[in-house]
Amino acid sequence: MSESQQYLTVTALTQYLKRKFEVDPYLGKVYLTGEVSNYRPRPNTHQYFSLKDDHAKISAIMFKSAFAKVKFQPEEGMKVLVVGRIGLYEPSGSYQIYVERMEPDGVGALYQAYEQLKKKLAAEGLFSAPKKPLPRFPKRIAVVTSRSGAVIRDIITTTRRRFPIAQIVLFPSQVQGDAAAAEISRQIERANAQGDFDTLIIGRGGGSIEDLWPFNEEVVARAIAQSQLPVISSVGHETDTTIADLVADVRAATPTAAAELAVPVYNDVLLQLKQDQTRVFNAFQNFVQRDRQRLNKLQTSYVFTQPNRLYEGYLQKLDFLNERLKQAGQNNFNLASQHYQRVFQQLRQQTPIHQVRQAQTQLLNLQQRLNRGTQLVVRQKRQQLTQTVQSLDLLSPLKIMTRGYAFVTADEQVVHGVKQLQPEQTVAIHMADGEAQAQITKIDGGK
């Protein structure tokens, strides 16, 4: 080995090669396609992975500031397009690509990010969660949108035209750009924190997918999902569907449509109130008419036309009770008298005059009621006795004999048939006004 030969250190060789990479115009900006490999997500820091194809592999690094601009989440095996520079990493002596931009190969980065977030939130149930109903008559409506855009003007104009008593409060926010998503979510939280709103509208006008992208950010979607106020989303045109639209309680195609969903038409409300008033009045009239018909029907029923039918079944029981009343009347009177004496003695001891008078009045009422009841029972029983005597008189044998009937006795025994008689036997014939003696001369036993 020649002594004149100069040996390089590993460091010197590595630094020489590194400078070659840095000054090579073809390696300063490389457009590369490959498949993501060995990717392990590292939140809030630099990302390390590899890019490979069927025959080769290259290490890749993407610094935190560059990765923050990536709209989708890289996945193992995903084909991507990257832009970066090739450099040499001195400690290992290996070359790698420093990725500055990255997007999916074949599908736009924003679309890929949209689909990934949509799938994630759907799995968490944010799209299928129960939707909060919109209040029918909101008093205060919060609007999160740009201060200078046409959205707030359309909402205010539509609300004043339809329901002028509602108050619109603007929570101004950027609606496009990198800082817009965080500001939109903060304003949603502010509107909820105030606690005196009925409805929340978020939105912006139409634009490209990049312009609408803040409404596809996860931070905005979660702010909408956590809102205690019902949220109406009006982002872009009718054909645009953002993540915010899917999470919101109601989606509106335009800001004007959002205002129309938020408030009713004042004149329609008045008309509805008048119709409801008429309906209630008619219902009341029908109710009164039905009750009047029922009352008329009741007035013609036997309860009023033949009231005696109500107590006919109780007359017999009343007779029995009258008898018991007659028997108990004196006992009740005696008990009442004894009670009166006791009360009178107590009152004499207590000496309140009004209590004595009250007791005397009660006793007098009891005596009058007892006397009336006793007299009524006596009259009823006297009538019953008269009717019974008349019935017995009609059945009396003497009464029957006055009509020409008589009966025969033999030896002071009533003769019931010819078998009790003998020829030549003397019998007595009893008639209404006396009796006569007769002798049996012939007995005929025929029918």
Curated annotation (Swiss-Prot):
The keyword Cytoplasm applies. GO terms for biological process: DNA catabolic process. It is found in: Cytoplasm. Keywords: Cytoplasm, Exonuclease, Hydrolase, Nuclease. Disulfide bonds: none annotated. It catalyses: Exonucleolytic cleavage in either 5'- to 3'- or 3'- to 5'-direction to yield nucleoside 5'-phosphates. InterPro entries: Exonuc_VII_L (IPR003753), Exonuc_VII_lsu_C (IPR020579), OB-fold_nuc-bd_dom (IPR025824). One of its GO terms (molecular function) is nucleic acid binding. GO terms for cellular component: cytoplasm; exodeoxyribonuclease VII complex. It comes from the Bacteria. The keyword Acyltransferase does not apply. Its EC number is 3.1.11.6. HAMAP family: Exonuc_7_L. Bidirectionally degrades single-stranded DNA into large acid-insoluble oligonucleotides, which are then degraded further into small acid-soluble oligonucleotides. Heterooligomer composed of large and small subunits. NCBIfam families: xseA. Belongs to the XseA family. This is Exodeoxyribonuclease 7 large subunit. The lineage of its organism: Bacteria, Bacillati, Bacillota, Bacilli, Lactobacillales.
